[in-house]
Amino acid sequence: MNEQQKQAISCGKGVNVVYSGAGTGKTTIITNRFAYLVNKEKVDPSRILAITFTKKAAKEMQFRILKLIDSSLAEKTNIYTFHSFCNKFLIQTLKKRFIIDDDISYFLKEFLADSKLDINLAKQIIDNFKNTFADFEINKLDQDERLISLCEHSLLNKDEEYSTLKTQLINAFISYEKNKILNNKLDFHDLLIKTCNLLSNDNDLLNQWSEQFQHILVDEFQDTNQIQYELIKMLVTKNKNLFLVGDNNQMIYRWRGAVNGIITALKHDFNVPKSNEFFINQNYRCDQNILAVANQILLKIMAYEKQVKTEKNLLFSTLNSDKKPVYFQAESVENQANWIFNKIKALNQTEKINFKDMAILFRKNRDITTMVELIEADGTIPLPKQKSYFNQLVKLQRVLIAISTRTNLDIKRALQALKIWSNDLKELWKQSDKTNLFDFLKWSELNQKNHSSKLKATGYFNLLIKLAEDQQINLLFTELFKKLKVDQTIENLLWKKLTEFQKDKTEFSLSEFITSLALEFDSIIENSSDTINLLTVHAAKGLEFEAVFIYGMNQGDFPLFLSQNQNDEQHLIDELKLFYVAITRAKRFLFITAVLQINNNSIKPSSFLNYINKSEYLDIATINYVLEQDDDFFDSTKKTDYTKKLRKESLDIIVGDLVTSRYFGKGVVVEVRDKEVLVAFKDTRYGMKWILKNHKSLTKALY
């Protein structure tokens, strides 16, 4: 550890704030602080609470702490996410268990399906709810106001439908809340709200829990939202020993409730002296050339936020190479993708970097879909299965919830996941005298002779319930894995989780397992195979890769501007911070790409690129089509003049011509543009590629 870290770790009691820049070892600092308190200050580990944001981060923290303290103390450590801590608190306090069901999007689809709203409009609102509403940590009294705000956000220029939509959404929310109460369910933001309500309304309970924890450590504090901050303040009521690690320049979750200026608010609330503030700026992740670019963006953020510009705010590293980050501007999305593919393959073959240690980062989710299609067409880069894994887990969770609650909505959702729900079944249910879907399924199984073709599948759900009631858990999950076609990788992980969960238990609790599964989604589906990482920048926060490609640095895309925020300075700052986070995910190689046109429409490069002194800090890829896997990029002694690889005259090529590439073999021309041709290569490893007509590697061939 360096001196900056040592000073922070060995600080005294009270509220201490550690400003730890990207890659400066936040986890190292917080885990060593935990160990310092136990080993040096002789604090009982059961009286230390460490909180972070993801299950994966919590597991990593626990793993590191147990290497620093006596292993016999493992059972006494309290390392949680905010949600898992609140879940434990509610179980211990209320002496009852809840089912965590955060699938608000399904509920809203069901509710809005019967409305007269335009289907595209309804989908737009559902997507907004899915992306933002489920993360709002709000007082119940503010919900109507937030819903109205969300309507305004989604319905610009749709005044005639606004009133209807507002009413529909508020009614949907009320129904959603009632459904949870009736079925003993909580969503993730309920966990926090219930915990805070109980603590704020019961002084004895507050004293008990704030007395229990002598020290509280919080990682990534800049990402906390208002209710999380209120929870922390209540938990330090007695002892007031709080150790916070964060970086305000990486605050990228304002859109889901993180409070801008939360660190400033805390300093005011707790009257934190300057002596209790620590600045860590030695980066252990990135090459100094990458940090030079990051610091250019950091200076702009500081200028916008009127921060004092000092050296302690800028990052430095002792990791130095002569490889500058590369900026590449392609003529089209396809050219951009091909260039990225070839660089990835070159890194894999020449630098021996595994695919899993490389990432393509996107500002928008929909760009990932486009890239997946292009990678599949290329056929040479292995794709991750995280999205498929996530969908499989969601379906499994839906079925388990239905087995537990047996409500109409949950059973219908489960039958859809099992591909049993059909129009015939729906019609027969309407015709029957059964209002409860579970009763109807039992009735239908007994009456299959009358409607055998339509009801033959309904007995399957009843079988699942019988297996659960008889505690035949292994048979239950074997059936589910087979029916839902769960991937072997996920199946193996779930069997392991089931084994661990059932250890020392005399009876299997389905609701308890559902909650455990919901709290660990992120750690179950993490990428463990050697496949390329395709992530939004938000999803990449906290991760690091040997090589990073920042995709689509174009104005309007990154920064992403919608009509309602194009003149919003705070939004611009948020986008700059997002760019800073993207840059600092890279350890050795950084590539930034943009395009000149999309769908034949010209598009400008991102204005953020103007904040970087390109001639000093970037290598500019001046040719848009470097098709070969070029070793020269990795050899600092070679400076390639790509213009030497072009003819003065372009080939005269038409659709249907047979051509030969020196690098990819024979292929057929399937599309021709002014300067380039799209070639479908016979070797399926290469798929289709755009090639400049005047590239020397391309020649016409004879049939």
Swiss-Prot record:
Entry keyword tRNA processing: no
GO molecular function: 3'-5' DNA helicase activity; ATP binding; ATP hydrolysis activity; DNA binding
Enzyme class: isomerase
Binding sites annotated in the UniProt record for ATP: 23-28, 285
Membrane-traversing stretches: none
Domain UvrD-like helicase ATP-binding: 1-287
Annotated GO biological process: DNA replication; recombinational repair
Sequence ranges assigned to domain UvrD-like helicase C-terminal in this UniProt record: 294-542
Protein keywords: ATP-binding, DNA damage, DNA repair, DNA replication, DNA-binding, Helicase, Hydrolase, Isomerase, Nucleotide-binding
Family of this protein: Belongs to the helicase family. UvrD subfamily.
Identification of the protein by name: Probable DNA helicase II homolog
Organism: Mycoplasma genitalium (strain ATCC 33530 / DSM 19775 / NCTC 10195 / G37) (Mycoplasmoides genitalium)
Lineage of the species this protein comes from: Bacteria, Bacillati, Mycoplasmatota, Mycoplasmoidales, Mycoplasmoidaceae
Gene that encodes it: uvrD
